[in-house]
Amino acid sequence: MKVVEQLKIEETQDLLIVSVKQQRLYHQKEGKSVKTYVASTSLKAPSCKEDSLGTPWGLHEVCEVIGVGQPLGMVFQGRKPIGLHHWDCEEDMQQKNLITSRILRLTGLQEGLNRGGDQDTFKRFVYLHGTNHEDRLGRPASSGCIQLGNQEVIDLANQVSSGSHLFISLN
């Protein structure tokens, strides 16, 4: 990948590619396609800026996998399970985009684009995570995060590890 070469970092065994235009996440292992997932990115225009609620683009790294061992549909707040499945939450809470099942926390790798200053993916708490609104997958629906179905994010979290690259493309 050209960006990896420019940044002078090693490619990782697993590569996740998110297409904002197609609302898909592509998983590659050692350069071979593993699986394609239907995803959702931000309802607002893509953006790397703080408080924009846009999905940031460029090269990222999965810096933490959170929630391994938690049941499907578990709701997280502040990256901690709250002890409720999304279907057990009050109606007003269910209206929100909840963070469910697993969290792959992201950190940007491109200084000035998605790392540092007011354009820092990690400080913006942009994740790849499950959603309580699986019916919205395939179209922009999030507040900046990348959303997958609950079973899909569990499966993905079981296959990738911290340090894996995730590239978010506007195409």
Task: Cite the ranges covered by each PLM segment.
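His/acidic/aromatic-lined binding-pocket segments of jelly-roll/cupin-type domains
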Residues: 15-18, 145-146
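Short beta-strands and strand-coil junctions in structured, solvent-facing domains, enriched
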Residues: 24, 46-47, 69-70, 113
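Extracytoplasmic
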Residues: 11-13, 20-22, 34, 57, ...
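Short, conserved beta-turn/loop elements at beta-strand boundaries and strand-helix junctions
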Residues: 30, 67-71
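Exported/periplasmic cell-wall-interacting domains
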Residues: 72-171
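Glycine-rich catalytic cores of cysteine/serine-nucleophile enzymes that process amide/ester linkages
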Residues: 21, 33-60, 66
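N-terminal post-signal-peptidase region of extra-cytosolic proteins
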Residues: 1-14, 38-52, 85-90
